[in-house]
């Protein structure tokens, strides 16, 4: 079998990065999942991270890490979630992240702190995330952020 040309390979990586990313996020947002869906969520998150690592710019690689932080938090792996979320927040504060990236990373960091049992940081991080979310330029971004904030706040409340 001959190897496809590099441009075709890059397009395939991009296709799978986007598809796996979107499916993993879709599964994280479900109120409940079967064991099979949980496995699918994990697999897609890691696959997305792999494909972005091969072809993505640093910002997309870091967004994939934030997805991994969400999955780790939902799995109850606080140490991993915290490590991934902290690196994401640091990156988006210093690099080319958008206002959305900074707001969402702060929300993920609050969730990771809660799952890690470091509850003293959670309230201030949620407040910071709320303020950042309210300042998003696009109404659709503000609404989507508010939905995620509500979802994650609900998950935190169950801990």
Spans of model-derived segments:
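Amphipathic alpha-helical segments of tetratricopeptide repeats
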Residues: 6, 25, 45-53, 86-94, ...
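Residue signature of alpha-solenoid helical repeat architecture, marking inter-repeat boundaries
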Residues: 11-19, 38-39, 59, 100, ...
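Alpha-helical linker/edge segments of TPR/alpha-solenoid repeat scaffolds
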Residues: 110-119, 149-159
């Amino acid at each position: 079998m001959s190897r496809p040309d590099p441009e075709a390979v890059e397009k395939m990586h991009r296709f799978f990065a986007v598809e796996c990313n979107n499916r993993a996020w879709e599964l994280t947002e479900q109120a409940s999942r079967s064991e099979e869906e949980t496995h699918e969520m994990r697999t897609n998150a890691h696959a997305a991270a792999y494909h972005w690592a091969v072809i993505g710019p640093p910002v997309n690689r870091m967004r994939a890490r934030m997805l991994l932080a969400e999955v780790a938090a939902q799995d109850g792996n606080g140490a991993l979630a915290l490590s991934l979320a902290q690196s994401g927040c640091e990156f988006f504060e210093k690099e080319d992240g958008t206002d959305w990236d900074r707001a969402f990373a702060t929300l993920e960091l609050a969730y990771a702190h809660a799952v890690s049992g470091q509850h003293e940081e959670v309230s201030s991080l949620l407040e910071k995330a709320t303020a950042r979310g309210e300042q998003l330029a696009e109404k659709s971004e503000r609404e989507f952020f508010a939905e995620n904030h509500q979802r994650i706040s609900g998950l935190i409340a169950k801990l």
